[in-house]
């Protein structure tokens, strides 16, 4: 049975990788990072650190990529050139002529993360040729870095040859409360055991799910901020890919306000002079 980590380079998956390095968890056969080609530089820096740290313990961190390229280029190419290739759907916010706000379909995770990883597992881990049947039964345990506060994200595998496992939920690891691991507890474990590293949130530069706080982090890097803003503008300026007039009439935006990203006021309440009665640092306990 092969043990493979779905490595997103975020807090939970980084902790699983390092717990395997320390022998707290079984030794992984490999960790797979699916590179969409549009992560912030701090994510790639952390990926490189993780690769070197895991290599000390004989665990390879493998980068897999979508065969057609990066998600940003694919989206822009479809939008501007109409070359007939398949549209890579980001869940952009949409503004209809009547002022109603919606959200587009989300297909990016499947196309640029799940599919490339499954192809790698079939070809490189199981040694299967394209369209060759996998052996019967579970061949791979695929670790998922999901903590108790986001347990609703824990989904079974659709492939019979692999099983999704959730060490923070199911494996009885000792945690500060003796039962389950929440995100803030995982952060505390990382700070105690690896105080010199900062684990970023792994998400595309132009991910529509960014909060204002996350957009402010992107804006600290002028090149990445310009990248996100120019993408936001290009999608509205050139998009003619919709299949009907109703969809073509809807403008698309990266920010939930349905305003151009350059024009959005990203300041926090404190920045605007509004006090707060509570510590707003998320402890990951609401389950959202």
Protein language model features and the residues they cover:
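Nucleotide-activated chemistry modules centered on ATP-dependent adenylation/adenylyltransferase
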Residues: 1-288
């Amino acid at each position: 049975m092969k043990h493979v980590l779905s490595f997103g380079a975020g807090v939970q998956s980084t902790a699983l990788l390092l717990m395997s390095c320390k022998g707290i968890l079984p030794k992984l056969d490999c960790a797979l990072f699916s590179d969409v080609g549009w992560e912030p530089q701090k994510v790639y820096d952390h990926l490189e650190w993780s690769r070197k740290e895991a290599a000390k313990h004989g665990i390879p961190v493998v980068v897999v990529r979508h065969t057609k390229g990066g998600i940003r280029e694919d989206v822009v190419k479809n939008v501007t050139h109409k070359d007939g290739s398949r549209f890579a759907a980001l869940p952009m916010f949409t503004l209809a002529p009547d002022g109603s706000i919606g959200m587009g379909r989300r297909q990016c995770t499947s196309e640029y993360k799940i599919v490339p990883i499954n192809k790698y597992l079939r070809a490189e881990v199981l040694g299967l040729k394209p369209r060759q049947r996998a052996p019967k039964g579970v061949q791979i345990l695929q670790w998922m870095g999901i903590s108790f506060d986001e347990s609703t994200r824990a989904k079974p595998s659709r492939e019979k040859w692999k099983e999704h496992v959730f060490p923070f939920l199911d494996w009885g690891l000792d945690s500060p409360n003796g039962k389950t691991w929440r995100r803030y507890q995982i952060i505390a474990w990382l700070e105690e055991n690896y105080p010199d590293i900062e684990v970023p949130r792994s998400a595309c530069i132009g991910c529509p799910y960014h909060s204002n706080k996350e957009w402010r982090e992107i804006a600290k890097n002028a090149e990445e901020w310009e990248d996100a803003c120019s993408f936001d503008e290009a999608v509205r300026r050139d998009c003619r890919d919709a299949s009907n007039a109703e969809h073509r009439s809807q403008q698309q935006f990266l920010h939930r306000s349905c305003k151009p990203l350059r024009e959005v006021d990203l300041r926090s309440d404190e920045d605007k002079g509004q006090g707060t009665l509570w510590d707003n640092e998320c402890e990951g306990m609401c389950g959202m």
